[in-house]
């Protein structure tokens, strides 16, 4: 008998006594694919009957088409980033000679806002279809503007109104090929770039004369409520122009981000065109007649604030009644007037400023300031007394430009530079915009707006005044003088305000040409003059 260990070994090496059924040892193999010939079958002949949708041959043919190697499409850069070779001299000369922008020598600003290329057939088609509707809504005669003026007199600005009015309505629409052409796109953007500053100056002059005792803060609120971007679509619809701006959309159902930018661009460009062709009086007529704006409407009133008591006199022409837009638009200064804009000067410089005549500042600092600014300018007056009176008023206006609000504003709210600063800020914006338009004929409006913003930054305005060492003559209140003179966070805005007030005074006394002289010759805003070593 074998030992137990050997018995266990024999048991372990032997087969199991329980046989498994043969059916369970089979493995089930499932067919997951069908082997097929990968060569595509020939296409069916036209005479053969159409194959059903689930035909194997049709499915194999489509699979073979999908398996074909397709090279990936190369991603080309956008067209605006593709560098083009410069034009040769002959083509460049031809382009400039055929450009309408160089066709008017007598009207350089209007000429610079004309399209950079002649209008195409698509442009003329739009003008034939829709221009009469726009002119009727704005209150203009329906005859073509080319018939205005004497004969072939291109010096008449109104002759170019049809072209500029067409450009004003061509806001950029990505689905419209006509508005994406270069001469239309740039022409429209250049018009809205000019028009925004025209509107700001128009309302500034109007409100300064309508509210002779009010500070500029409430006036800015009125302007924003009237022509802010939220209110502009309402005015577009009030003038029945919404079908021209949004021909395929319902203005009331559009969301804000789709409705406001095109309406704002068309509104600004419209007043740029009107200003170029007819001047500022026509801007007032279209604002208050065609669009129906009401400065006394409840929606555009400034918020209530604590008002300082104004005990000083205003000029006689403002005491009788409140001026209307017709008074401002129809006003023409008399031939022997002291100033270029007499009523605007009276609205900004109170009559009580004569009490400061002959004080220490007038005796010590006024001659130095006038010498730096090149005042008084030579004028051809019939009567010498007119020249003398103008120079006296100019000296008082200069003293008001340097009169900081901390000095007298609490007791006498208008004995400070705020109202002159308001008009100066708007006129310097417009003068710089006109300068950039005439200087950069090819530039679109967005590029000009960025250039304009960089040239007129507040820190630069004050710096130009400090470069002329005029900030030493600012009259501060005794309690804050040390802080303003030694803290640049306080000093820089105050010098900027004085700079803008000087521009406002120059506009009131001598007109827009003197603002250009101060900005580009005296203060050198463009920084192109050589620096003293």
UniProtKB/Swiss-Prot annotation:
Record's subcellular location: Plastid, Chloroplast
Region described as Disordered: spans on this chain: 31-57, 66-85
Residue range covered by the transit peptide: 1-30
Keywords attached to this entry: Chloroplast, mRNA processing, mRNA splicing, Plastid, Repeat, Ribonucleoprotein, RNA-binding, Transit peptide
Residues annotated as transmembrane: none
PANTHER family, per the entry: RIBONUCLEASE III (PTHR11207), RIBONUCLEASE III DOMAIN-CONTAINING PROTEIN RNC1, CHLOROPLASTIC (PTHR11207:SF34)
Known partners and oligomeric status: Interacts with RNA. Part of large ribonucleo-protein particles that contain CAF1 and/or CAF2.
Chain's role: Binds specific group II introns in chloroplasts and facilitates their splicing. Acts on both subgroup IIA and subgroup IIB introns. The substrates of the subgroup II also require the CRM domain proteins CAF1 or CAF2. Binds both single-stranded and double-stranded RNA non-specifically, but lacks endonuclease activity. Required for plastid ribosome biogenesis.
Name of the protein in its database record: Ribonuclease III domain-containing protein RNC1, chloroplastic
Taxon lineage: Eukaryota, Viridiplantae, Streptophyta, Embryophyta, Tracheophyta
Gene: RNC1
């Amino acid at each position: 008998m074998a030992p137990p260990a050997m018995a266990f070994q024999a048991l372990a090496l032997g087969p199991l006594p329980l046989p498994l059924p043969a059916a369970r040892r089979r493995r089930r193999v499932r067919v997951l694919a069908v082997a097929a010939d990968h060569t595509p079958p020939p296409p069916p002949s036209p005479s053969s009957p159409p194959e059903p949708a689930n035909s194997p041959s049709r499915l194999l043919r489509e699979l073979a088409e999908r398996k074909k190697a397709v090279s990936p499409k190369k991603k080309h850069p956008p067209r605006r980033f593709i560098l083009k070779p410069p034009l040769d001299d002959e083509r460049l000369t031809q382009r400039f000679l055929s450009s309408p922008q160089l066709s008017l020598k007598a009207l350089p600003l209007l000429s610079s806002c004309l399209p950079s290329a002649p209008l195409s057939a698509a442009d003329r088609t739009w003008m034939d279809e829709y221009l009469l509707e726009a002119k009727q809504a704005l209150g203009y005669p329906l005859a073509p503007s080319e018939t205005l003026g004497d004969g072939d007199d291109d010096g008449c600005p109104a002759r170019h109104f049809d072209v500029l009015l067409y450009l004003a309505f061509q806001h950029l629409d990505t689905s419209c090929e006509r508005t994406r052409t270069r001469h239309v796109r740039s022409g429209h953007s250049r018009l809205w770039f000019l028009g925004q500053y025209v509107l700001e100056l128009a309302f500034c002059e109007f409100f300064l004369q309508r509210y002779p005792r009010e500070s500029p803060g409430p006036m800015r609120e009125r302007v924003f409520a009237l022509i802010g971007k939220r209110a502009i679509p309402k005015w577009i619809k009030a003038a029945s122009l919404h079908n021209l701006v949004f021909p395929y959309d319902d203005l009331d159902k559009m969301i804000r981000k789709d409705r406001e930018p095109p309406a704002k661009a068309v509104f600004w460009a419209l007043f740029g065109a009107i200003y170029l062709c007819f001047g500022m009086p026509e801007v007032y007529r279209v604002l208050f007649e065609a669009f129906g704006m009401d400065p006394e409407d409840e929606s555009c009133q400034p918020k209530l604030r604590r008002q300082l008591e104004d005990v000083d006199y205003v000029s006689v022409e403002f005491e009788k009644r409140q001026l209307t837009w017709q008074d401002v638009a129809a006003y023409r200064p008399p031939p022997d007037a002291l100033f270029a804009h007499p009523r605007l000067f009276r609205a900004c410089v109170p009559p009580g400023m004569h009490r400061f005549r002959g004080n220490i500042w007038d005796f010590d600092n006024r001659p130095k300031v006038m010498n730096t600014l090149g005042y008084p300018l030579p004028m051809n007056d019939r009567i010498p007394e007119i020249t003398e009176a103008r120079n006296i008023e100019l000296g008082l206006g200069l003293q008001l430009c340097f009169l900081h609000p901390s000095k007298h504003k609490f007791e006498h709210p208008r004995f400070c530079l705020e109202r002159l600063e308001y008009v100066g800020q708007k006129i310097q914006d417009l003068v710089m915009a006109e300068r950039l338009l005439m200087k950069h004929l090819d530039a679109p409006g967005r590029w000009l707006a960025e250039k304009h913003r960089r040239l007129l930054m507040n820190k630069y305005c004050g710096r130009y005044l400090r470069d002329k060492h005029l900030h030493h003559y600012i009259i501060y209140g005794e309690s804050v003088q040390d802080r303003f003179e030694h803290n640049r966070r306080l000093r820089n805005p105050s010098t900027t305000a004085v700079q803008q007030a000087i521009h406002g005074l120059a506009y009131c006394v001598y007109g827009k040409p003197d603002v250009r002289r101060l900005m580009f010759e005296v203060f050198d805003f463009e920084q192109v003059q050589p620096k003293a070593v």
